[in-house]
Amino acid sequence: MAEAVFHAPKRKRRVYETYESPLPIPFGQDHGPLKEFKIFRAEMINNNVIVRNAEDIEQLYGKGYFGKGILSRSRPSFTISDPKLVAKWKDMKTNMPIITSKRYQHSVEWAAELMRRQGQDESTVRRILKDYTKPLEHPPVKRNEEAQVHDKLNSGMVSNMEGTAGGERPSVVNGDSGKSGGVGDPREPLGCLQEGSGCHPTTESFEKSVREDASPLPHVCCCKQDALILQRGLHHEDGSQHIGLLHPGDRGPDHEYVLVEEAECAMSEREAAPNEELVQRNRLICRRNPYRIFEYLQLSLEEAFFLVYALGCLSIYYEKEPLTIVKLWKAFTVVQPTFRTTYMAYHYFRSKGWVPKVGLKYGTDLLLYRKGPPFYHASYSVIIELVDDHFEGSLRRPLSWKSLAALSRVSVNVSKELMLCYLIKPSTMTDKEMESPECMKRIKVQEVILSRWVSSRERSDQDDL
């Protein structure tokens, strides 16, 4: 067995992001002289770890590329805006989504169907939707300072880091963060914004005309027990939920209000030429979105446990109760029987500066990125095995020569190297010791790079010598 040759990671041609300081220690330019350590909050729902708070999502993905958006390929960037309309109305300089009238009608129909399933009669459904979707008069401008301060105080538990001589292990209880959601602030309506007009949603004149919506709608409870739905999935003490139509969320005005492009006929031209074809002009009308869709950050079990155990910057809740590190270790093992093995390898590579991601796409356990997926292509495809001192034991995935050659060929075709990561467990380690993450202190790691031997290349190399 020869010593493996290191190949430098291949950088992507086009990079659209800037590299941010990784968790948990911020750089001085990010937070100034006062460095704060924040505890993020996640929830365990249907055997998945979900982060709801928008600020937590941005921090976790931007500083370490943890998790992925449930509606996106990687970075949570889902929006209901129509790209063509956004390009058409680019001079508007607004943060609100711009959608077509047809798309908005679909949202109204979905909201109506949801309320019918909850037992609401047809007249109530029509009355609520008619009041909720009526055009608004003034634009929702930037949030007031009081709401911003309140959001900051409730975004999570922030505590100052105190330097110690040695890195202490996080507390057995995996932290406690504050309320993950922001406060629902009143929004202001927006008048009709005609195409080509000089009306601007963020002008100073509009900022002075901000007023509250004085007609809040009654709450409608959902009898279903779905823990994660497209709307705001907030639980009440009686186990019911409020649908997104009636419960203002914490994701800002872009999820509460939308600009709908609608066509209107020019009255002056109709009066002047009644027999001619009516001239239509498009305009943007601000309406409340009756069926809001939120994107959350989904963490893999390995990523979630690393944030809790290794970095101590995440608190995971199950039914409003924080889970301890030992409980998480046992719960994740029940959910995913191979969790202990995969996490040990994840912890090892993360500690060395790699960004591991799921390697299911290429038939392996992990993919290793330098810095993160936006900057470099994955360098290694990793297969993980837990063995004893003699490299024996029940393998997770017994490989034949045929399957091994297939994996090697797939990895080579996508410019990656196939790595076999052996986690060597002492023969004296008992199953009881494996029930705690402290067992990793006795685990050794052996990395093996698998490369295909090509006879013709070998002969040409010998001829050169």
Curated annotation (Swiss-Prot):
Species per Swiss-Prot/TrEMBL record: Homo sapiens
Source species taxonomy: Eukaryota, Metazoa, Chordata, Craniata, Vertebrata
The enzyme's E.C. designation: 4.6.1.16
Subunit note: tRNA splicing endonuclease is a heterotetramer composed of isoform 1 of TSEN2, TSEN15, TSEN34/LENG5 and TSEN54. tRNA splicing endonuclease complex also contains proteins of the pre-mRNA 3'-end processing machinery such as CLP1, CPSF1, CPSF4 and CSTF2. Isoform 2 belongs to a different complex that contains TSEN54 but low level of TSEN15 and TSEN34/LENG5.
Residues found modified as Phosphoserine: 408, 411, 415
CDD domains: tRNA-intron_lyase_C
Active site positions: 369, 377, 416
Keyword Phosphoprotein recorded: yes
Name of this protein: tRNA-splicing endonuclease subunit Sen2
GO cellular component, one term: tRNA-intron endonuclease complex
